[in-house]
């Protein structure tokens, strides 16, 4: 009996070790892997499950997560809608937010979104300085004055103000942060590695599906 018990314990220990080594995690836990927002926020995705990524171009952790988010988007389920939201915690984050919305207004966000990240983190260009930003945009083939006009437009100013308010309303403590269905928040800090963050995101989506199925 002692021998059987020994081998049982050994097998369990080995199994746990293999699970840890393979990156398999236990079920997500509130407070450790995600939090519930104090008040649910309205979504803009209709019947789809809304996923928001709050980010800042200058954030190295956002930059690290970005390729994983892009890969996840390619296999995203049809019942899920994804949207980037540039966060604003401080005044020096506003230029990045306005840059994002100006690119959207000009219809070139998809073309230049990654390049903005690379310019900041690989080329070490401080795009929070407007003269450098405008010159850089011109080098990307965007007419300088056209970008300046979009950047300073009333519409972009309004969107930047809305991002500032959303950063407060969603109870953000930092970025990157992912909000699912206006209720569940996970972040790079909570998620661990970028891969862990994506796994938590996927499990939160499954959680929302199950909750909706019960209604």
Regions found by a protein language model. Name each.
Residues 66-73, 96-100, 113, 130, ...:
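Extracytoplasmic/secreted envelope proteins and their assembly/folding machinery
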Residues 3-5, 139-215:
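C-terminal cap of thioredoxin/glutaredoxin-like
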Residues 57-61, 88-92, 118-123, 155-156, ...:
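Solvent-exposed loop/turn segments at secondary-structure junctions
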Residues 62, 92-93, 126, 190, ...:
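Alpha-helix N-cap/helix-start motif
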Residues 27-37, 125, 130, 196, ...:
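Periplasmic c-type cytochrome electron-transfer domains
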Residues 2-94, 164, 206-215:
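Extracytoplasmic thiol/disulfide redox context detector
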Residues 75-106, 110-138:
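Structural microenvironment flanking redox-active thiols in thiol-disulfide oxidoreductases
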